[in-house]
Amino acid sequence: MKSISTLGICLRASQDLAKTRPISLLSTRSFANLTQGTSTYHSLSIRSIRHNRLEARYTNILNRNILPYKNYSTGTAPPPPPPPPPPHDKNAKGKFLFNRIGRAFTFSLSSVIVLGATCISVLVVYLILSELFLPSGDTRTFNKAVRMLESNELAHEALGFKKGQRVKAHGEQHADKWARNRPAQSVRTRGADGKDYLFMKFQVESPSGKYGTVTLEQVDRTFWSSEFLYIALDMPGNKRIYIKEPKFQSKKYVPKVGSLASNDGFLGLKWGPKKDD
């Protein structure tokens, strides 16, 4: 009788559980525990019931097969289809040759432009350096001649300025009033001995207002050295003054101011277009 009553109590408990959750969720092991005897019912606790419920819930979820996971794996997925073949072009060879020719022309043109720009840059740098730093440059020759004139005592007396004072030196007079825009006239020639000769002419003006014309000749001994052959100062109404005495030519070799101002042109050369007499 005692075992029958125990079985009835277990069935009633199972019915109570079935009201809240279907009996199918209970595992076989938990149902067998209910029917083992009197001591089995008393061993059930709230913790074991919760454990059985969670076990039944997860078992049901895993048995459903919600997603076909094998189709979402890169290892089992089928390979992608191959790309379609390119369309056949009859002019493919011609286009290839035209592309190669165009690239070769572009490369050649770019190379020529780069080489041309490099050569022009080197030439400009050389001209600037030779003009400013080489002893044979016009700028250094002009400055050197002016310093020699300022330190010459005969030039002090003729132009009427004291030692230590500066004189104005510039090219021929013309419409521009700024002296810096009147560069000195110079001509370079190659002599019979194969050396370069520089002829230069410029005007000087002292603080007292007196002025004169300076003519000079310079020879380039080497690439880094040059020498004045003569430096002459001519003033209206005065005799020629030699800042640098000529060594290799007679004093009559220096052109006169009158001949320089005449129609013979600068240093005996006619500049500009030929005019009919």
Curated annotation (Swiss-Prot):
Keyword terms: Membrane, Mitochondrion, Mitochondrion inner membrane, Protein transport, Transit peptide, Translocation, Transmembrane, Transmembrane helix, Transport
Function: Essential component of the TIM23 complex, a complex that mediates the translocation of transit peptide-containing proteins across the mitochondrial inner membrane. Required to keep the TOM and the TIM23 complexes in close contact. At some point, it is released from the TOM23 complex to allow protein translocation into the mitochondrial matrix.
Native species: Debaryomyces hansenii (strain ATCC 36239 / CBS 767 / BCRC 21394 / JCM 1990 / NBRC 0083 / IGC 2968) (Yeast)
Parts of the chain that traverse the membrane: 109-129
Name of the protein: Mitochondrial import inner membrane translocase subunit TIM21
Compartment list: Mitochondrion inner membrane
UniProt topology in membrane: Single-pass membrane protein
Family, as annotated: Belongs to the TIM21 family.
Region (Disordered): 72-91
